[in-house]
Amino acid sequence: MIVSALNISEDITVDVDSAEPITQRERDRDYLELKRRVTQAGLLDRQYIYYAWKIPSVIVMVAGSIVVMAMFSGVLWVQLLNAAFLALAFTNLGFLGHDAGHRQMFRKVRQNDWVLLGVGFLTGMTPSWWQDKHNTHHRAPNQMDVDGDIEVSLFAFTEEQALAMKGIGRLTVKHQAVLFYPLLMLTALSLLFGGIAYQIRKERMRYPIAEPVLVVAGLASYLAVIFILLGPWYGAAFIAVHRALGGIYMGSVFAPNHKGMPILEKEDEMDFLHQQVLTARDVQGSPLADFWYGGLNYQIEHHLFPNMPRNNLKSCQVIVRDFCAEKGIPYHETGVWQSHKEILGFLHEVSRPLRQKKA
């Protein structure tokens, strides 16, 4: 088995091949033991009280933004700040949809689906498309030709990808470390249009009638509210700022999860426990960080236990970190700024061949 050993910082190099051979049965037993400890701690139990206030609080954020639109419709600077606030609210709606998609909220699948459909209506996201894409990522994180999150037209995550780029993609990849954050402004639109394309192709949809109806109705409502309350010019400015900042926010949350961590070839085989831990990065938690990242700063724990309610991930981290130390499994956690430093350094290094002068 070959895993690309990438230097994600000066101190961290992951090389799985150097580890002592362990049988598949032993590795499966390791994960079952970890799951037993986590279950015994009650961390997989549903958190109904948490979501009973979390869901309404995010809806209040959206409603508050609409109120500000109505009350200060003629004040541009207020509306631009309001657009930034709505970007925060919409991303938090996305976090709720993410939780529901992983069945973290309720035991019954349909109840989680109701939340996911509601998020689809409010944000314009197509639930089935997102679940299909995201579940594939969870099954094989950072695995070439499998994980769609490392198959992006404007970025390269291996030197082979960089050298294979053509046209505008080659230009953006050549300077991808510099262009990374500006290009994140396209994230929200990419997610929106990716879902619409999925619907047009009529691919697998859990709710083939409800999803298109809710998404179209939601987008129509979004545009109507903004343009009726703000008018065409202020409305257009509001949407531009909302979508751009929403993209940067989402991208800044998603990127630290796996970017700059080891990448597996398609033919590589790795047990569940090792693949989920070695390809993910945790960002140190705090009340502010936990809110900002929607719990996804505990990415290793989330990948090991996707259906764990997000407010239990911090407690789970203690168990997982100790278990990895016990088993000699590299566990990577860093701060917010260091995580972005690692990402940019990784992107710069991967694209280096495109900047080298030909002999």
Language-model segments: residues:
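Conserved catalytic cores of large enzyme domains
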Residues: 7-10, 16, 260, 339, ...
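Short, charged cytosolic
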Residues: 13-37, 179-190
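Conserved oxyanion/phosphate-binding beta-strand-loop segments in alpha/beta enzyme cores
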Residues: 26-35, 60-67, 268-269, 273-287
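Cytosolic juxtamembrane amphipathic/interface segments immediately preceding
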Residues: 37-48, 161-169
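Alpha-helical bilayer-embedded segments of polytopic membrane proteins, i.e.
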Residues: 46-93, 120-125, 174-191, 205-253
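Membrane-embedded catalytic scaffold of the fatty acid hydroxylase/desaturase
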Residues: 85-204, 265-354
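Transmembrane alpha-helix/helix-exit interface in multi-pass inner-membrane proteins
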Residues: 185, 250-267
